[in-house]
Every structure is written in C-alpha cells, then in structure tokens.
Amino acid sequence: RDNALAIAGLLNRDIGGPSAKPYQPSGYYEAIQFPDRNYVADTDDRQYRRGLYMHWQRTFLHPMLANFDAPSREDALCTRTSANTPQQALTLLNDPQFVEAARVFAGSLLLSRRPKMDDAALLN
C-alpha cells in the first residue's frame, strides 16, 4: 500500500499523530461483539498516511492487511510468512486505495508526456 501511494505521489509522510482510517467496507465491524462502532474513514490526506499509522482493530484486521499476510499483533516475529494467493491479486485490482493510486499515477503519466500529432487521430 505504501509503495502504491508513493509511486502515485499520494503518500502522506507526516510523522506522529493519530492513526489514519483508510476506506473500510461498509458493515465490516458489525460482527464485532462490542458496543456499536462507527468507523468513519478519513477523507483528507490522512487516509494516505503510511501503513504504520493505519487503524488496526485487534481482532479484525483491515481486509487489505489480512489479504497480504499481516502478522498478528499478539506476538513479536522476526520473519513474516509469505504467500501468493488470488485474493492478493484481486485486492490490488479492486481495493479503492489501490484503484485511486493507479488512477492518479496514470493521470500523472498522461500529463507528463508530450502530445503528438497522431494522438488526435487516435481520439477520433
């Protein structure tokens, strides 16, 4: 996630402060057996903070973190498990933060190239 945001130029590199709340699927916390939780995703540049600052619910990892084998927070680990699963590819293709990073990166590529005469013909 941090790499995708950095490549797109979206990564917020601020140090310290409260945790960031990126997009979560609606109703994701409904299964938690605690009092009602109202998760409100950040809509400003805080949603692009480094993964280190992402809000973690101890028993319910953010779906993107779970899909990419994030370790549990109960134990200290020297190495992480590594797996390649179809869910990871689907996350990269469909998670709103990855889609937004790809859109912004593609836009910056299009704006950075010099237009050619053939471009007008391609559009028609």
Set out the residue ranges of the language-model regions.
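An acidic, gly/pro-interrupted, aromatic-rich
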Residues: R1-L122
